């Protein structure tokens, strides 16, 4: 009986082992074999995976690779884009690029030995303004040498706008033209530093201030120097309010002052007993709080 059971369990183990292997060869290397056998070789890693991936073939036309000897310079211009900007020669890359032939009429080229400086100023014009080209002399005429430190001369066709001011009147007001003399009459010379006179139709508004008191305050009439000020000295509104508060704190509000015959008398109700109002049960008041009867007590609700 026991032998048959052992045989059955052995057959079961063999069948399970056959199912687990399922035609696979047994591995030759095992970590628990002794002596240890050499492990299988590890496949090499892809080198340069930490760099940029290679550029695909269909995108190599975007930016050409920079040669090793020119990586510190500007990248070379592709062949199909050389019509935009001509290439800069190697010996002039630190200078300004040469000006094309068709643009030399804009700005003349700077000499090679002076490209890093400013163009030289002629010796005889270093303290003056640069000369005006021939084709621009009609814009602004040149200023004569003897008048450069003065005001520029007035052109002939503009002399009718503002007449010149005479030398002896430059510190005064300019003269009034003849056609505008009817607008404002001229002010005499000895009154220009004073106040203008008050017209006749406005003399009833404010009397003129005397000349010797214009820089002072107006004089105080003699009959008011000894009088009291016009506004009487009354306590302020805040002082009156504080006085009423103090009087209210000192009074007994629970007592009736009464009259002269009967004297003060106290209130009828007891201070600790509330007054009944005839309400019973749970009723809702005016604000739906459920605190009692909606009608007010006889005292007014306070």
Swiss-Prot record:
Residues 24-47, 51-58, 62-69, 73-80, 84-91, 95-102, 106-113, 117-124, 128-135, 139-146, 150-157, 161-168, 172-179, 183-190, 194-201, 205-212, 216-223, 227-273, 294-302 form a propeptide. Disulfide bonds join 279-293. GO terms for cellular component: extracellular region. Expressed by the venom gland. Coiled coil: none annotated. The keyword Secreted applies. GO terms for biological process: regulation of blood pressure; vasodilation. It is found in: Secreted. The modification Pyrrolidone carboxylic acid is found at residues 48, 59, 70, 81, 92, 103, 114, 125, 136, 147, 158, 169, 180, 191, 202, 213, 224. Residues 1-23 form the signal peptide. Residues 32-302 are annotated as: Disordered. Residues 240-255, 262-273 have a biased composition (Basic and acidic residues). Keywords: Cleavage on pair of basic residues, Disulfide bond, Hypotensive agent, Metalloenzyme inhibitor, Metalloprotease inhibitor, Protease inhibitor, Pyrrolidone carboxylic acid, Repeat, Secreted, Signal, Toxin, Vasoactive, Vasodilator. Residues 33-44 have a biased composition (Pro residues). GO terms for molecular function: peptidase inhibitor activity; toxin activity. pEKW peptides may serve as metalloproteinase inhibitors during glandular storage. Their inhibition may be instantly disengaged, by dilution or physiochemical change, when venom is injected into tissue of the victim. In the C-terminal section; belongs to the natriuretic peptide family. This is Snake venom metalloprotease inhibitor 02A10. It comes from Cerastes cerastes.
